[in-house]
A protein has these predicted regions:
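Positively charged n-region of N-terminal signal peptides that target proteins for export
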Residues: 1-4
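Conserved, well-structured interaction surfaces
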Residues: 41-56, 77-147, 163-199
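Alpha-helical transmembrane segments and their juxtamembrane interfaces
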Residues: 12-13, 223
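Sec-dependent N-terminal signal peptides
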Residues: 6-12
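An aromatic- and glycine-enriched ligand-binding surface/loop that stacks and positions planar moieties
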Residues: 20-79, 150, 154, 185-186, ...
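Short, conserved phosphate-binding/catalytic loop or strand-edge motifs used
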Residues: 155-161
Length: 340
């Protein structure tokens, strides 16, 4: 009888030890944050997923054309709550506020757990890391243009973060803009040039143009809102506008050429060369186009832009149309370039 008890105790001890060893193992299916982003394949897959949130001509909406809604160029049937002073962070649904910070969390997860060994940090891996910095700048800029002064998300907040710990004060809009420009500078130092992927991935030149756009936006905002309730706490308009000029000079020294009739052998005049920037199916050889998306039925990358244009649909909120001032501008241009 004692032998049976001893055998039972020994067996129980073995099982407990085995269970303990098994529980110490990393799950085979669920990736570990500590070991996930440690090689080029994992880094590539993760960064590829960040592209999905960028504006494009999907099943609904006009992609980047829809960004013109409620500008001087397009008038929407549904008025812009931001322009009317009604935009709030807490309105139901996936708001602009939620969209921006949800995407920032995804980017910051990558930057927090990126742990590729230095010996394996090839130019390809470093360029992917540069893309992540571009995405973080992009989503901060998205929020800046809609809300002005915002909390900057410069680190990843995991599931253990407390509510109190997430009460991050907003930074002045000028400081937010500079943070964005610093991220784009970091991206520029790591990214490949356009020639590597023919503009199908974020590149060094695209980061520079994005930085110019951010600096121009903030520089002109501070210039024309000086002395108003919307002014930045620290006036840095001249500094931002100077950055636009500096980046522009550097960009053209990198050999970027404009699409003119001399560079585009498929056209006979400058009007057609300009038109090819917007009506070509393949822009890989058009150096002026720094970042674009190639649609392909074979790859199931499709859109409904033609249908939306014919129906006037701009996005899920409804239709939008060209403003009279935009049409007048084009008519004036045609009269100038073709007097006959």
């Amino acid at each position: 009888m004692k032998k049976i008890y001893l055998l039972a105790v020994a067996l129980a001890g073995t099982l407990l030890t085995s269970c303990s060893d098994f529980l110490d193992k990393v799950p085979l299916v669920v990736p570990s944050s500590e070991t996930f982003l440690t090689n080029q394949s994992a880094v590539t897959n993760y960064v590829n997923g960040l592209y999905i949130a960028l504006p494009s001509a999907g099943a609904y909406g006009m992609g980047i054309m829809g960004e013109e809604k409620n500008s001087d160029n397009m008038v929407a049937m549904v008025y812009d709550r931001r322009m009317n002073g009604e935009l709030q962070e807490s309105i139901g649904g996936v708001t602009e506020w939620q969209k921006g910070y949800q995407n920032l969390r995804s980017v910051n997860y990558f930057l927090e757990y990126y742990k590729v060994p230095a010996a394996e940090e090839t130019a390809e891996v470093l360029s992917l890391k540069g893309e992540a910095y571009f995405f973080r700048a992009y989503w901060h800029y998205y929020l800046l243009t809609k809300f002005g002064s915002i909390p900057v998300m410069d680190k990843f907040w995991d599931g253990n973060a407390t509510v109190g710990g997430l009460q991050i004060p907003a930074r002045d809009r000028s400081a937010v803009a500079q943070f964005i420009l610093d991220d784009l500078k970091a991206a520029k130092e790591l990214l490949y040039s356009r020639s590597k992927y023919q503009g199908l991935r974020i590149c060094k030149e695209a980061a520079m143009v994005m930085a110019m756009r951010v600096a121009l936006f903030e520089g002109t905002w501070e210039k024309y809102h000086k002395g108003t309730d919307f002014a930045a706490a620290e006036y840095k308009s001249d500094d931002f506008l100077q950055q636009v000029l500096t980046l522009g000079d550097e960009l053209f020294q990198m050999g970027i050429t404009l699409n003119t009739k001399e560079n585009d052998k498929s056209v006979k005049n400058i009007d057609d060369a300009y038109g090819n920037l917007f009506n070509s199916k393949d822009l890989s050889a058009t150096q002026e186009v720094l970042f674009w998306k190639k649609y392909s039925i074979a790859d199931n990358l499709v859109h409904s832009l033609n249908t939306n244009l014919s129906s006037g649909m701009c996005d899920a909120e409804g239709p939008a149309g060209l403003s009279q001032s935009l049409v007048d501008n084009y008519l004036s241009c045609l009269l100038y370039t073709s007097p006959s």
